[in-house]
């Protein structure tokens, strides 16, 4: 989607390519068409000339970083609820299950409306990008059209994302509950079909199978979700062991299963592409099972504390060989910033160290940075593509600026070394310190370029045309009052639904119910 762009970056580079390894070095990095094609740990004139002589970089734009700037991998949010963003900062008065009923379900159900959803999703994508999130694993609502809209917005803004339409047909309010397992699965199939047109290679946006959590799904829905993920080779995301009351509910609903994790395993929902949020109260047998299945965990320390759910022992998970990343868990977590989640992960590990009387439980700076980047990349099954810097990986990167001229809230002194300045950035900075945010070799945010739809790189005509048509079809099907549209677009419309009344009532007899009123937005916001 970028064309053949090429850039060379010269300056300080910081990353954590493996757990416990923090590398701070001078570097020259060459990027062609979104990927790193040249990386030397030097920024001498000779190295720059070598980069410029690379056959793919002969016409590269040179970016020389300032003395207090450095390159850092893009941050990865492994668990965030996009529709809950308007509730950020509220709802600390009740625990998890009551919180869902009082705050979350009413808000999410209101986002069946495309215009309301558009306003929310544009702002959450803008905000997360401005905070350095280059990859987000999003829960959407149970509505297919607005989930498709979220995918369009992420694609247009240039944020890598997993987009999950929630599957939930049990123990949910009447106004926010799917009628059956089959209707839930069919709606998910529609989203998969739409996103396969929007991004066939799944380079930027990918559908993710999203059973909300075990209690919200009947057994046939859980089984169907597992089958869909297997059939389409898709990632899976859900919640596990966030709250002790939730765990007791799972035991009541699935008495034949050994544990919460065993419920997911039985329905083929524990795979190397599975992201399990929270995992605070796992039993040892469950940890062994997750290790065996190579499933990943999203550590969400902010919401774990705000909702009084508990303290997750990340050290124990890491020592067991489980991949762990960080999640903001908006809006259980109040901030759409992975750096804030990182800070809370640090505090959680220190609090738990005191409670357990074990200093080894504490996470150090390099480990925390790993969770926010390469660890998160492993959790979303993209560890070979993003999360650190290496030839062949995508250029998903931040240019961090610690200079006072950026209105920085980080105070730097002459005696500060790079490890000191890095720690200050982690614990005292905000979005004012992000000069540039790059995804796939494309500048998408940062104070030097605020992301918006008008200046984003246009989609190719083929994707825009086809994707927009299918988006209309989803909109039509789901705006029919209590009526289901045809499973596939009528062939007389060239494979797509259209808005011409004559087509629907004459050529497509039987495709739509005779008494149906089909609504099509004239301007869906897609470009």
Curated annotation (Swiss-Prot):
Protein's pathway: Purine metabolism; guanine degradation; xanthine from guanine: step 1/1
Chain sites annotated for binding Zn(2+): 79, 81, 239, 329
Known catalytic reactions: guanine + H2O + H(+) = xanthine + NH4(+)
The protein's required cofactors: Zn(2+)
UniProtKB keywords: Hydrolase, Metal-binding, Zinc
Residues engaged in binding substrate: 81-84, 212-213, 239-242, 329
GO molecular function: guanine deaminase activity; zinc ion binding
Record flagged with keyword Metal-binding: yes
rRNA-binding recorded as keyword: no
Cofactor binding annotation: Binds 1 zinc ion per subunit.
EC number: 3.5.4.3
GO CC aspect terms: cytosol
InterPro entries: Amidohydro-rel (IPR006680), Guanine_deaminase (IPR014311), Metal-dep_hydrolase_composite (IPR011059), Metal_Hydrolase (IPR032466), Metallo-dep_hydrolases (IPR051607)
GO biological process, one term: guanine catabolic process
Role noted for this protein: Catalyzes the hydrolytic deamination of guanine, producing xanthine and ammonia.
Similarity comment: Belongs to the metallo-dependent hydrolases superfamily. ATZ/TRZ family.
Protein name: Probable guanine deaminase
Species whose genome carries this gene: Schizosaccharomyces pombe (strain 972 / ATCC 24843)
């Amino acid at each position: 989607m970028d064309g053949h762009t090429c850039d060379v970056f010269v300056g300080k580079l910081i990353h954590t390519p493996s757990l416990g390894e923090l590398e701070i070095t001078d570097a020259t990095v060459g990027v062609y068409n979104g990927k790193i094609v040249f990386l030397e740990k030097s920024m001498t004139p000779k190295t720059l000339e070598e980069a410029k002589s690379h056959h793919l970089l002969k016409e590269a734009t040179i970016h020389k970083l300032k003395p207090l700037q450095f390159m850092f991998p893009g941050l990865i949010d492994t668990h965030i609820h996009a529709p809950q963003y308007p509730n950020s900062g509220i709802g600390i008065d009740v625990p998890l299950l009551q919180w869902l009923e009082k705050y979350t379900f009413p808000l999410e159900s209101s986002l069946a409306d495309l215009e309301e959803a558009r306003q929310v999703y544009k702002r959450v994508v803008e905000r997360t990008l401005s905070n350095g999130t280059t990859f987000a694993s999003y829960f959407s609502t149970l509505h297919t059209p607005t989930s498709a809209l979220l995918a369009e917005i992420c694609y247009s803004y240039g944020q890598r994302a997993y987009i999950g339409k929630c599957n939930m047909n049990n123990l949910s309010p009447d106004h926010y509950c799917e009628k059956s397992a089959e209707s839930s699965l069919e709606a998910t199939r529609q989203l998969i079909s739409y996103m396969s047109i929007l991004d066939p290679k799944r380079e930027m946006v990918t559908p993710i199978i999203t059973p909300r959590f075990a209690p919200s799904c009947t057994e046939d829905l859980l089984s169907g979700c597992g089958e869909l993920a297997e059939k389409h080779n898709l990632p899976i995301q859900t919640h596990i062991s966030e709250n002790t009351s939730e765990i007791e509910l799972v035991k009541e609903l699935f008495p034949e299963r050994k544990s919460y994790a065993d419920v997911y395993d039985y329905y083929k929902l524990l795979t190397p592409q599975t992201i399990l949020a929270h995992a605070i109260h796992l039993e040892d047998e469950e940890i062994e099972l997750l290790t065996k299945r190579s499933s990943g965990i999203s550590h969400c320390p902010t919401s774990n504390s705000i909702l009084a759910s508990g303290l997750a022992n990340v050290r124990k998970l890491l020592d067991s060989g489980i991949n762990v990343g960080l999640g903001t868990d908006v809006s259980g977590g109040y901030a759409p910033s992975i750096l804030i989640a990182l800070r809370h992960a640090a505090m959680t590990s220190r609090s738990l160290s005191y409670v357990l009387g074990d200093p080894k439980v504490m996470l150090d700076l390099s480990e925390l940075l790993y969770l926010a980047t390469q660890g998160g990349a492993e959790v979303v099954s993209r560890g070979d593509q993003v999360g650190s810097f290496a030839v062949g990986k995508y250029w998903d990167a931040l240019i961090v600026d610690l200079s006072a001229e950026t209105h920085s809230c980080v105070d730097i002194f002459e005696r500060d070394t790079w490890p000191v300045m890095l720690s200050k950035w982690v614990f005292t900075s905000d979005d004012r310190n992000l000069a540039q945010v790059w995804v796939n070799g494309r500048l998408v945010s940062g104070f030097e370029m605020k992301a918006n739809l008008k200046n984003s790189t246009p989609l190719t005509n083929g994707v825009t045309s086809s994707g927009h048509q299918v988006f209309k079809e989803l909109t039509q099907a789901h705006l029919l009052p209590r009526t289901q549209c045809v499973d596939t677009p009528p062939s007389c419309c060239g494979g797509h639904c259209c808005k011409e009344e004559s087509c629907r009532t004459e050529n497509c007899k039987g495709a739509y119910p005779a008494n149906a009123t089909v609504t099509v937005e004239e301007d869906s916001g897609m470009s």
